[in-house]
Amino acid sequence: MSNPSPQAPEEEASTSVCRPQSCSMASASRRHRRERRFRRYLSAGRLVRAQALLQRHPGLDVDAGQPPPLHRACARHDAPALCLLLRLGADPAHQDRHGDTALHAAARQGPDAYTDFFLPLLSRCPSAMGIKNKDGETPGQILGWGPPWDSAEEEEDEEVSKEREWRQKLQGELEDEWQEVIGRFEDDASRDTQEPESFSAWSERLAREHAQKQRQQLEAEGSCRPPRAEGSSHSWRQHEEEQRLFRERARAKEKELCESRARRAQEAQRDKGPEPPRAGPRAEHPRGAERGSLWRFGDVPWPCPGGGDPEAMAAALVARGPPLEEQGALKRYLRVQQVRWHPDRFLQRFRSQIETWELGRVMGAVTALSQALNRHAEALK
C-alpha cells in the first residue's frame, strides 16, 4: 500500500508557482475589459462615465485599441471626445498598425476638420508633424502642403546651389531672431519691453538684403561679361522697381493697420465712457488696445489687397517677377515666394499675431496660395 504523504509538498509548491501567474493574468484581463468599456463609453458619447471610469482606475491606457481612441474621434468628427482624450493625457503621436498618428487621421477628414481637430492636435504635439506612416507620408503631405523647401532634394547647378544655401542661412538667422524677440512677450508683466519686428519691417529688411546680394552678383557678372551689360542693367532696373513697389505696399499696409488699431481703440474707449485713471503701469494698456493689435483676415499683407482668390494672388506674384524669357531668374523668384508663403513657415512666424478665431480661415487661404505657387513652379520645369 503506497503512502501519498511525500507528494503533498510537491503539490503545494506547484500551486504556489501557478497562483501568481493566474493572478497577473486575471489582473491583465480586468484591465483589458475596463479599457474596452472606456472605448465603448466614448463611442456612445457617455463622456462623463468614461472620465469617471478613468478616475477610479488611473492605470488604464487611454491610447489602447486599434484604431486608438484619438483616431476614432477624428474619424467620427467627435470634437468633445477629442478634447476629453487630450485632457486625460492621450498622445497625439501614438501610431496605429498602419503607422498613422492622430494628425494623419485628422488630415484625412479634409478642410472641415482643420480647426476643430487638426489645430488642437498640432498645438499639443508639434513634433508629430514630422512622423511618417508606413506609406512614407506626413500629415502635412496629406493636407497637400508638401515638404518644406529646405528639405527638398533635387539636382541644381552651382549658382542655384549657392543661392539656396544663402537663403537657408538667412532664414535660420531670421527665425532665431524672431523667436528671441517673441520670447520676451510670453509673460504679461514684460509689456514695456521692445515690440517684436512687424511683418512689413521683416519683409523690407529681407528685400533689402536680397537686393544687395543681387547687386553684387550683377556687378561681378558685368565685369566678366561686358556684352550682356545692357540686358543685366535692364533686369536690375526692373527688379529695383519691383522691390520699391513691394516696400511701398508694405508701408501702406502698416499705416493702415496702425490707423485701424487706433480707430478700434477710440471706439472701445467711447463705448466704455470716461473712467477715472487707475493706479499702476497696467492702466496705460487697456484690453481693447491689446486685442486690436492682433491681425484679422484683411490685415494680413496678401499679394492682393484683402486676400481673394488664391489663383489670382499667385498670378499677381508671378506677374511681379522676372519675365518668362528669363527662366532662371523666374525660378529663383518663385522659390523665394514658395518659402515665404509655405504654411509651416507662416504658422511658425505669425501665429501669435493672428486672431484665434481667424486662424483657420487665414491658414486655409495660405495653404491654397502655396499650392497655387507650387503649380506655377511645376509648370516651369
From Swiss-Prot:
Ranges of compositional bias, category Basic and acidic residues: 205-218, 237-290
Domain of life per record: Eukaryota
InterPro entries, sorted: Ankyrin_rpt-contain_sf (IPR036770), NFKBIL1 (IPR038753)
UniProt GO molecular function: transcription regulator inhibitor activity
ANK repeat placement: 64-93, 97-134
Classification via PROSITE patterns: ANK_REP_REGION
GO annotations of cellular component type: nucleoplasm; nucleus
Any Gene Ontology biological process: negative regulation of NF-kappaB transcription factor activity
UniProtKB keywords: ANK repeat, Nucleus, Phosphoprotein, Repeat
Chain positions covered by the region annotation Disordered: 1-34, 132-167, 186-298
UniProt feature, compositional bias: Polar residues: 14-27
Coiled coil: none
Modified residue annotations for Phosphoserine: 151
Biased composition (Acidic residues): 151-160
Subcellular location: Nucleus
Tissues/organs with expression: High expression found in heart muscle, liver, kidney and skin. Not detected in spleen, lung and brain.
Role according to the record: Involved in the regulation of innate immune response. Acts as negative regulator of Toll-like receptor and interferon-regulatory factor (IRF) signaling pathways. Contributes to the negative regulation of transcriptional activation of NF-kappa-B target genes in response to endogenous pro-inflammatory stimuli.
Quaternary structure annotation from Swiss-Prot or TrEMBL: Interacts with CACTIN (via N-terminal domain); the interaction occurs in a pro-inflammatory-independent manner.
Name the record gives this protein: NF-kappa-B inhibitor-like protein 1
Species name: Mus musculus (Mouse)
